[in-house]
């Protein structure tokens, strides 16, 4: 249980077998045959405890983190903290008590996560009887070793419990010698502790074998002359130990255990039934064991009169309709055996519940290997690949069965398999639901709307995965496919996706171990995409495009199954030891399913038949052809290559209906989303902003974000010229996005719902344009995924911040850091609990030219020295949860690699960030204005004043007309600016950008003011969005530069170009 080796690892990777980290390369274990090594001189076997005899702390930590929603790796990182002098190592040398360890350990974890971590709960789980049980395969091996006259020992890095007894949940009678670090004051890999163990055994190093799960401990033992075995999983380690000792250590049936008391069946009546079935006259005893796998239908091993059998039965109690259909299992296996599909030989189906309590069937036992760990520890990479190839091949064989030839044409309904399955699993889930799981609710709504258009019909297994296959002990050959309970006729791609579940689950997932955190290339295991291509090649099919849908559906099924197991565990019906854990796992798996639904939404959008952006007539700038610039190409630089006098071959797109078909379809999809999702949610969102919980993100907003992702309405803002490969965004031009931005602007909440809100949009564009790959990986990706938020710190209270060169905050170089000092205010979004990044602008060289004095740094919000002085209000509005803060930066130390683009480039970065952002602001303002005018028109039609409707009043009519004219004027001007940016770049559009920034906010203020006037006092209330519209329209008259600055810019450019 030592973590010492981790301190010496160059990448600080833990090698505990079931941690959430990559597997290391396993040694070659050779053949599975037992070979007697004649002349063996081994006289003792020495065992580590954690990871060898009982589950390792890493495995327990990973399980506990999942169940308690603690970020994976937290416990291991805290255990590693401090190296030899850290609390964990001192605890194992008995230098501190359990109480002292938990106090220091808890402090470390809490500092990492900035919140309290219940480490007592982890320690209780680690030392509990439920977890700290000796592996049966090791118990059996120790028994056989001692029966042969060899000594056994435990050599463990261990600790004292609060009762002052060492943690040793083992039968001490199994061992001749026990050496524990807490009793000796030294830990592995200190050579003294190995020598002490050998001295107590009275042996030389070469006469012993040492088993440990940590490479560093084994290395020191090997240096002393002890033979070592690396334990990646107990069963594989026992096989290697058998080869070294030359005799068998396992005499039982693999993967079985004594029958649980709640799963016992009457032996007498079963024995009578089997004697009649098999014609057996013997009076010998019936041996009955229970298989570890098969949590849905209890499965038993039976030995009677030299016959090895397997019995599968329905679980007891009231069951969901159509579930646990063992009758169908019997029928399908009997039919497929005649079609060359490897299945066990079934003998009889007994539907008489009086025999053992529920219906069951009996089949012959098929000896072989069942690989419960999909990483296949102990095998060569080539053998692992061969195993997965064989798995793929047998799946193709199942899907190629002639239904009519084997009499299975009525085994299920033909066609519409996925729709029926969705309905079935929704029904099953609802029947076993114990609480509301948001991701499941979203999937229940999403799946029926995204069904595959074309489906083939074959036999489908329904639960096809590696641990439902029996393999030949020595060859990569499938001997039998098990667990046919969910089989039917349906879409074969559902089987293919289901067989890839492990590729997306962590290795420590309690119910189905995964390989998501393994290096598949190193292991030799095909990635999910390669596995799917392999299947398509064998079946002669083109690859499907909607792979993500099938994965979403598969994980949705798993979540529904886990929920059913959990519900049955509450009544004692489920047979698996994992059943009670599945309550929390259902939510984990449903979130995975939703992730695939989101990916499918992105795929649908990105694979729309967009016209090549380089040849769109409405934004491609046709330049004179030259040898350096082929016809139709375009530079993505913001520097114009010719005069804006050159016009494009297409016109300005002034209406959404004139957009290209795919973008027009996107616009209408967004409009439908706004009408169906966003507008109806506004009252609840407004109530949240006024509630005591307003400084926490609204759960409804988060739910709407997930729905927007799934609909492909996410990250639409990045302009094509900044992201020409569409790597990060939708690849829209400024004009295309302007129309969508206006639509989002009709609601205060829509930009955030679609991840298109400031200041994140500007910061993400900054990172795309100027960030290093490391900066993008650290900050851009979480922002794009909506997992983090950010702020931009430029405005200062002591200077006119409209002139960026006035910035006084200092950035001083010190060793490998920059030290920041400064006073900022009106920092939008800094109060948001999700804000993880502050993009900070400060002065690095006050003696440089004015436009080269400023620099931009990426500052993590958890950096010491950032002090929020107070929140600021706008006309009394707090704008929670993001808010606007006044902040001091006092001696804030930031690594040099957090500098953006380089020292002295801050002004350039700020200007580059503002160009598209001003288009966004202005189009949102036009959205404000359109919504305000629509509300005004509806209001004046329904109100009477002085005996006639308001709509008939002359002044009201004049206001409506004036508002319409001003909106249209502003829209045309903004679209023209966006069009020019698409054609010639930001610099060439500087005049137009300045004009729209001085026009749009003033226009919006006037239009909204007229609407408020028409509403009267109601217009000032939070019952309508008008008051907030007006607030932000007014604020934008100086945000991103005051109107006066833009008027001056326009005048200077006018004089420069026109005189």
Swiss-Prot record:
InterPro entries: ACAD10-like (IPR052898), ACAD10_11_N (IPR041726), Acyl-CoA_Oxase/DH_mid-dom (IPR006091), Acyl-CoA_Oxase/DH_mid-dom_sf (IPR046373), AcylCo_DH-like_C (IPR036250), AcylCo_DH/oxidase_C (IPR009075), AcylCoA_DH/ox_N (IPR013786), AcylCoA_DH/ox_N_sf (IPR037069). It catalyses: a 2,3-saturated acyl-CoA + A = a 2,3-dehydroacyl-CoA + AH2. GO terms for cellular component: cytoplasm; mitochondrial matrix; mitochondrion. Widely expressed with highest expression in fetal brain, followed by heart, muscle, kidney and adult brain. Expression levels varying from isoform to isoform. Its cofactor is FAD. FAD binds at residues 792-802, 828, 943, 1013, 1044. Its EC number is 1.3.99.-. One of its GO terms (molecular function) is acyl-CoA dehydrogenase activity. Acyl-CoA dehydrogenase only active with R- and S-2-methyl-C15-CoA. Belongs to the acyl-CoA dehydrogenase family. PANTHER family: AMINOGLYCOSIDE PHOSPHOTRANSFERASE DOMAIN-CONTAINING PROTEIN, HYDROLASE, PUTATIVE (AFU_ORTHOLOGUE AFUA_1G12880)-RELATED. This is Acyl-CoA dehydrogenase family member 10. The gene is ACAD10.
């Amino acid at each position: 249980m030592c973590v010492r080796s981790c301190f010496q690892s160059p990448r600080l990777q833990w090698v505990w077998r079931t941690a959430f980290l990559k597997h290391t390369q396993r040694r070659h274990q050779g053949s599975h045959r037992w070979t007697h090594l004649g002349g063996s001189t081994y006289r003792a076997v020495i065992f580590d405890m954690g990871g060898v005899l009982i589950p390792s702390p890493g495995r327990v930590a990973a399980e506990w983190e999942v169940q308690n929603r603690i970020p994976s790796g937290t416990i291991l990182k805290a255990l590693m903290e401090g190296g030899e002098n850290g609390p964990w190592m001192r605890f194992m040398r008995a230098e501190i008590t359990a109480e002292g360890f938990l106090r220091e350990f808890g402090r470390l974890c809490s500092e990492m996560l900035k919140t309290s971590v219940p480490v007592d709960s982890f320690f209780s789980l680690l030392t509990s009887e439920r977890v700290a049980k000796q592996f049966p395969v090791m118990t059996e091996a120790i028994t056989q070793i001692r029966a042969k006259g060899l000594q056994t020992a435990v050599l463990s890095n261990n600790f004292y419990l609060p009762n002052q007894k060492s943690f040793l949940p083992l039968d001490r009678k199994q061992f001749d010698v026990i050496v524990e670090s807490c009793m000796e004051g030294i830990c592995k890999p200190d050579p003294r502790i190995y020598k002490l163990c050998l001295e107590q055994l009275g042996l030389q190093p070469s006469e012993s074998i040492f088993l440990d799960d940590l490479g560093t401990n084994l290395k020191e033992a090997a240096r002393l002359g002890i033979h070592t075995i690396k334990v990646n999983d107990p069963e594989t380690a026992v096989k290697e130990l058998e080869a070294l000792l030359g005799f068998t250590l396992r005499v039982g049936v693999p993967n079985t255990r004594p029958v649980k008391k709640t799963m016992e069946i009457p032996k007498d009546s079963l024995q009578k039934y089997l004697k009649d079935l098999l014609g057996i006259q013997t009076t010998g005893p019936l041996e009955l064991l229970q298989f570890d796998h098969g949590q849905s239908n209890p499965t038993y091993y039976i030995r009677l009169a030299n016959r090895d059998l397997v019995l599968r039965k329905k679980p007891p109690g009231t069951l969901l309709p159509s579930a646990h259909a063992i009758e169908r299992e019997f029928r399908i296996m009997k039919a497929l055996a005649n079609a060359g599909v490897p299945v066990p030989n079934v003998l009889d189906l007994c539907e008489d519940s009086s025999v053992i309590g529920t219906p069951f069937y009996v089949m012959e036992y098929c000896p072989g290997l069942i690989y419960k760990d999909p990483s296949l520890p102990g095998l060569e990479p080539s053998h692992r690949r061969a195993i997965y190839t064989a798995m793929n091949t047998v799946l193709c064989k199942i899907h190629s069965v002639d239904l009519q030839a084997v009499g299975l044409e009525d085994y299920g309904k033909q066609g519409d398999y996925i729709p029926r399955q969705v309905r079935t699993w929704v029904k099953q889930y609802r029947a076993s639901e114990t609480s509301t799981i948001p991701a499941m609710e979203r999937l229940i709504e999403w799946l029926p709307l995204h069904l595959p258009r074309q489906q083939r019909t074959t036999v489908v297994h329904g639960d096809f995965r590696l641990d439902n296959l029996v393999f030949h002990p020595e060859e990569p050959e499938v001997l039998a496919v098990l667990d046919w309970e969910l089989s039917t006729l349906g879409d074969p791609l559902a089987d293919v996706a289901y067989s890839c579940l492990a590729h997306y689950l962590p290795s420590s997932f309690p119910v189905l171990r995964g390989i998501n955190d393994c290096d598949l290339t190193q292991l030799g295991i095909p990635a999910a995409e390669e596995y799917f291509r392999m299947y398509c090649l064998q079946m002669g099919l083109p690859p499907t495009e909607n792979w993500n849908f099938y994965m979403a559906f598969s994980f949705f099924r798993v979540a529904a199954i886990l929920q059913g197991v959990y519900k049955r565990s509450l009544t004692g019906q489920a047979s698996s030891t994992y059943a009670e854990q599945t309550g929390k796992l259902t939510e984990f798996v449903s979130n995975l399913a939703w992730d695939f639904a989101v990916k499918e939404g992105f795929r649908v959008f990105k694979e729309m038949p967009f016209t090549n952006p380089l040849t769109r007539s409405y934004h491609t700038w046709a330049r004179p052809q030259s040898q350096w610039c082929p016809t139709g190409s375009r530079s993505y630089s913001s520097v114009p290559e010719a005069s804006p006098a050159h016009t494009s071959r297409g016109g300005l797109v002034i209406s959404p209906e004139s957009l290209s078909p795919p973008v027009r379809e996107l616009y209408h999809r967004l409009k439908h989303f706004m009408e169906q999702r966003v507008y109806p949610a506004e009252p609840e969102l407004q109530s949240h902003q006024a509630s005591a919980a307003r400084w926490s993100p609204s759960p409804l907003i988060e739910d709407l974000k997930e729905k927007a992702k799934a609909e492909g309405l996410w990250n639409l803002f990045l302009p094509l010229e900044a992201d020409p490969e569409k790597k990060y965004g939708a690849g829209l031009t400024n004009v295309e996005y302007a129309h969508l931005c206006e639509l989002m602007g009709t609601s205060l909440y829509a930009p955030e719902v679609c991840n298109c809100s400031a200041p994140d949009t500007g910061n993400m564009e900054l990172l795309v344009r100027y960030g290093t790959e490391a900066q993008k990986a650290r900050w851009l990706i979480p922002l794009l995924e909506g997992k983090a938020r950010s702020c931009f710190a430029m405005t200062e209270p002591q200077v006119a911040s409209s002139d960026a060169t006035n910035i006084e905050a200092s950035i001083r170089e010190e060793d490998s850091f920059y030290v920041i000092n400064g006073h900022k205010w009106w920092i939008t979004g800094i109060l948001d609990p999700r804000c993880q990044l502050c993009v900070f602008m400060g002065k690095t060289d006050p003696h440089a030219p004015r436009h080269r004095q400023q620099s931009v740094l990426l500052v993590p919000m958890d950096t010491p020295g950032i002090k929020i002085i107070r929140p600021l209000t706008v006309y009394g509005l707090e704008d929670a949860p993001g808010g606007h803060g006044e902040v001091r930066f006092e001696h804030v130390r930031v690594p040099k690699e957090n500098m953006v683009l380089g020292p002295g480039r801050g002004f350039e970065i700020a200007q580059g960030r503002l160009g598209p952002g001003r288009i966004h602001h202005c189009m949102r303002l036009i959205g404000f204005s359109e919504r305000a005018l629509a509300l005004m028109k509806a209001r004046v039609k329904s109100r009477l004043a002085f005996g006639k409707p308001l709509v008939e009043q002359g002044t009201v009519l004049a206001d409506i007309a004036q508002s319409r004219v001003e909106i249209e004027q502003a829209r045309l001007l903004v679209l023209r600016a966006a069009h020019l940016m698409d054609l010639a770049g930001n610099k060439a559009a500087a005049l137009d950008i300045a004009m729209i920034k001085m026009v749009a906010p003033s226009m919006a203020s006037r239009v909204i003011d007229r609407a408020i006037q028409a509403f009267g006092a109601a217009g000032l209330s939070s019952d309508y969005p008008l008051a907030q519209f007006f607030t932000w329209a007014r604020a934008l008259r100086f945000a991103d530069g005051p109107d006066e600055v833009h008027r001056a810019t326009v005048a200077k450019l006018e004089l420069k170009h026109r005189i």
